[in-house]
Amino acid sequence: MMIRLASRTSALALCTALATSFALPAQASGIDSVRPKAETTPLFDDEAGGNANADDPAIWRNTAAPGRSLVIATAKQGGLRVYDLDARQVQSLPAPAGPSTDDKPGRFNNVDLVQGLRLNGARTDVAVVSDRGNDRLRIYRIDRDKPGGPLTDVTDPGARPVFSADQDEINEQQTAYGLATWTDRTTGRSYALVSQRNRTRIALLELLPTAAGTVDYRQVRTLDLPSSFRLPNGATWTPCAEPGELPQVEGMVVDPADGTLYAGQEDVGIWRIDAGLTGTPTLIDKVREYGVPGTYDEQTEECTPGADPGFGGTHLTADVEGLTLVTEPDGDGYLLASSQGDDTFVAYDRERDEDNEYENAFRIAAASTTLDGSEVCDGAAALNAPLGTRYPRGLLVVQDGQETPGDGDREATGFKFVDLGEVVDTLD
């Protein structure tokens, strides 16, 4: 079996092919399904569609009017989209262009929120976005009094690249990728944790409001996860990839109660890390493909997997994506992860005292012939709080990497809105 790795689409094909090559219990019929209540209009990754490709959502709760809460979502080169709770678009913001036509354009990858950032003397909610194309963060103020255009760019003009030394390095695109925000309850300082594309590095960036009403940031420290792993049989395993690429992280979420970062290393598993990037990371679960050797063929740009030595996990099929938390006031809840290779979502106990043990899994299946489920899901966001009459028990928003029905041969993606109460009932 030969697997091409030259593009994101090809990487998804790798996951699918590997999934079908193993006897995976998660592909059996025993996993329960929930169904979406709404979906966004499809996004198309072509010139006519503005090269828009759905990736990662965040849910902003309007505390004054929860029924008018918003979903803020990245569309890669298509910029940022803002939706109401009926999944209708209320605002579209473009990704910034590159410095010149020869440079990479802006490409928004992940988004997360910070509540109550002090800006211009007032507490303000902001959306923080990783701009992979320009290797920067973009920060947007959220204004509940502007329903037709609630987001305003407040990124400081002097904001520096996150990982790159110059524009040439930016164009190599080992740039800002995954993102999660965190506010330290002890100090009140707010941060973004940002992963580096095609590398194992995670950076901790402190958000810095300025006197001009903009937001800058500074790097506090970085942490490098392993790229190779010692197996129980004494062998050393490195996930197969194109030459020069390392197993990257994208999906990340921070538990606000104790400052724990959960980071999904796509071809490896889920790490538990102190959000301050101190201490030793703990791998709490592995993908099924963990330990499977692969040989990369430069002529075909393909990877041939070898025999499975049996050291992988039993719940996740690579890529692991879309980490999000379902939080309860008493500390209970779930860590959810998108098991992209078999189109399931895996739930772990939120509590570290329980060692984040596996709890259950579910799928998001089609609700009708016109409202499909979620496949090859990238980003996900959950909010366990009442959101008006539409979602009185909270909301789960997930990316759909294969939006159907599409438009002929055009690649279509979008977002599905799911009643979080139904998800919790399924997990319990």
Regions inferred by a protein language model and the residue ranges of each:
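Detector for methionine-enriched segments
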Residues: 1-2, 252
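Secretory targeting and sorting signals
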Residues: 2-28
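Sequence/structural signature of beta-propeller domains
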Residues: 29-428
